[in-house]
Curated annotation (Swiss-Prot):
Keywords: Host cytoplasm, Host Golgi apparatus, Lipoprotein, Palmitate, Phosphoprotein, Virion, Virion tegument. It holds the Pfam family Herpes_U44. One of its GO terms (cellular component) is viral tegument. Disulfide bonds: none annotated. It comes from Equine herpesvirus 2 (strain 86/87). Its main location: virion. The gene is 55. A lipid is attached at residue 11 (S-palmitoyl cysteine). Phosphorylated. Palmitoylation is necessary for Golgi localization. This is Tegument protein UL51 homolog.
Length: 224
């Protein structure tokens, strides 16, 4: 028994008939609407092509290069922040680390604002301005190398045992100085282990000022 609302196909049963592709009317009215223009571009692109592919031409090559350089800087900052968020920073290092993290986040916000301006405003920045921005990022993060060492230590050792000796390592004298201090001769040699008492009451008073020497001037004697 067959019915009109039942259709048999080679792939199965379609109770309400075989579905057809939904029809979408092509927008042919051009208005000053960024969302409409964006939808038209997305609709008109061939399969497998994105808006980013369209920018990879001679006109957008400079913008892509600059955006890539800024993205690398932002990714590096994100990596630092993720490292320090994954471990517990000792209390003795929290003030220094917090100050550097605040600088890194402020620089990352500057980079993000620049990339947003390049994407939304369709503008590019010249190489000199980009170098100034990157140099500013390096200037405001002068302790990046020290943070790299600290981050490497945090990554290698997840515990906080390594931080217990930081103060002693920083404040202790160098090894050569320590060895020299260890083999230095004592000022007072007291083999009996006693202590020499000094009577402060018998301490002599201030030394009097020296008497100036008599003058040895020559006096001319008239000849007789």
């Amino acid at each position: 028994m067959s019915s009109r609302w039942i259709q048999w196909t080679c792939c199965g049963l379609w109770p309400f008939g075989k579905s057809s592709r939904q029809y979408r009317q092509i927008i042919n009215v051009y208005e000053d609407d960024s969302e409409r223009v964006r939808a038209e571009i997305d609709m008109g692109l061939p399969p497998g092509v994105s808006v980013g592919d369209l920018l990879q031409n001679r006109q957008g090559e400079e913008a892509i290069r600059q955006a890539h350089m800024l993205a690398l800087q932002s990714n590096a900052i994100t990596d630092y922040l993720q490292r320090f968020d994954s471990v517990r920073v000792p209390e003795s290092c929290q003030s220094i680390v917090s100050a550097q993290i605040a600088k890194l986040r402020s620089v990352q916000h500057i980079i993000w604002n620049t990339m947003i301006s390049m994407a939304v405003g369709n503008v590019t920045i010249d190489d000199s301005t980009l170098k100034v921005l990157l140099n500013k990022q390096a200037g405001e993060s002068m302790a990046l190398m020290e943070m790299e060492k600290l981050a490497a230590a945090l990554k290698m050792d997840g515990s906080t045992d390594w931080a217990q000796n930081i103060a002693s390592v920083v404040t202790a004298p160098p090894r050569a100085a320590r060895e020299q201090m260890a083999f230095r001769e004592p000022i007072y040699d007291d083999p009996e282990g006693g202590m020499e008492m000094i009577d402060l009451s018998s301490t002599p008073g201030p030394t009097p000022a020296p008497t100036p020497a008599p003058s040895m001037e020559r006096v001319a004697v008239p000849a007789s």
